[in-house]
Every structure is written in structure tokens, then in C-alpha cells.
């Protein structure tokens, strides 16, 4: 560092400030230090190398922090894996950060960028996005993964169409009273509820007003919601949980209370996680093609990093209904 300082005609403290991206250095002085670093092939660490090259070849990814959910969430793991595969194919690495649900993307960006650690940011839906429009407006490459965003480039599944397909399937089997277990309103749950309601409307069937219960995408919330729904005076003949975790909880409640699936009650989930094919009976669900979702999000981020002309603001990937043994016609329709 002292050799660089001597070559640039500055103090070693100034070189340190340039290397660490700290304020208080004029543009001219910074340029002299960077030129000296290049001429001397100075390689003190990742931050300085990034300054010299102009690229870190690392992308940050921010996902929700929930010890009981994040890394037990097969959909999220596949999404991360898809993004990482695309990054690796282009010689990039991933720096993963977890943040409390509902905020934290901006603080993660500041931490990543303070030492020039990342070239762009992928933000998963559950983190929240209040601070992201300012980042995107500043020209910083950022992509939201998993839900639509008006002001930030995004890649997300067609949640409404997926839920429509599930409800249409259950209606076609003969179910009329379909109970729904929804998720947090800030996430994809709103789109899934719209799809469910639209399927009823298109089938010209009356939507039951008393068969919706909230959940939080956990197994326990699905268990509790199933209990509330099945305790109705006129209980549903089918349950549609807005993710597989809650559907697994519903299956557990039904089994513990002597209800056969699908003999007494059909059950469907959403996300088509690994659990969907492992539970008994195997669960009807909607595949979000999570690996491809992560890969496409990374591709869009590279379009922004490389400043390609007119990258898409929104990419919507269709899901696929996967029918398994947990759904069947209700009694009296067989």
C-alpha cells in the first residue's frame, strides 16, 4: 500500500480510503490511486480488485430470515440454486444475505456495496421492497424475484393462473364448497386468491363466503386453519392451501381427526415442493418451476449489469398443475 501511495503521490491513508470506498477523496486523487494500482498490479483484496476492473463478478441475493422456514423451504432453495447456476455459468459468485421479512434490502445493499462487493442485487419476494425503487431509480441493478413490482424489474410466477387451475380442477371434480387457506397478503397470496375467485366466477358458481382462513405459509398455520374450516356447520369437501407447507398441515389435521383424504376431503397445495410427492397421499399442487425462476431472474440482472437496451420490466413464468392422489370427486359424485 505504501508503494502505491508513493507512486500516486498521496498518503497510505488515502490509498486505504480509496480501496475501501470511503468518502473524502477527490475524483482526481482517486483516479491517480487507481492508475498506480493498475501499473503496480497491486492486489490487496477483493475490494481493490473490483475497483481496478470495475466489476466484482459477484451478485448479492437477499432472502427472508426465518430459521423455521427459509432453509426448509424447498421452493426457495430451488430458486437460489437456479440463480446460482446461471451466475456460475458466467463466472460469477453469489453473496447470500438473510433479512427479516418486511424490510432490509436497502441495508443489505449498503453492506454489500460499501467495499464494492457486488455488481447487482436479487431480492426475493418475502424480504419486502419499500426501499428498492430508489435503488433502481439510481441505476443500481436490482431484480425482484417472486412477485410483481411496479417500479423495479421483476421475475415472478403466474400465481393467479396457477390458483385458477387448482380451483378449476376441484370444481370439475364436483366440489362446490372449497375451503382456502391463504398466506400473508403482502406476498403472492393476493394473486392466488384472485385466481381462486375467478375460477368460481367463470364456472358460474357461487363463491362460499365463509370458507377462507388465513395462514402464514407454515405447517402449523395450515393445521390450525384446517381445524377451523372443518369445524364449520357446513364444512368444505375440499381444501386448497396456498402453499404446500400449509397443505401438509391440513393433511395432518385431517388424519388426526379421522378424515380420509381424498375419500372425505380433497386437499391441494401450491409450489410443488419435494414434500408434495412424499406425503401420503401425494399432494396435488402447482409447480412454479422454481429453478427456472431463479435462472431467469439472474439473466435479467445480467441484462441490467451489462446495460443492454430495453430489458423487460416484468417476466411472468407460467406454472403447471400437477394432479396427484390427494384430490378426487366428493362423495356422491363418484
What feature does the model see in each segment?
Residues 7, 39, 82-90, 137-144, ...:
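Bacterial carbohydrate/catabolite-sensing allosteric modules
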Residues 58-62, 66-168, 172, 229:
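Alpha-helical recognition/docking segments in bacterial nutrient-uptake
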Residues 1-57, 331-334:
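N-terminal helix-turn-helix DNA-binding module of bacterial transcription factors
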Residues 45-48, 106-111, 128-130, 224-228, ...:
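A generic local structural motif
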Residues 22, 69, 185-186:
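Short strand->helix junction
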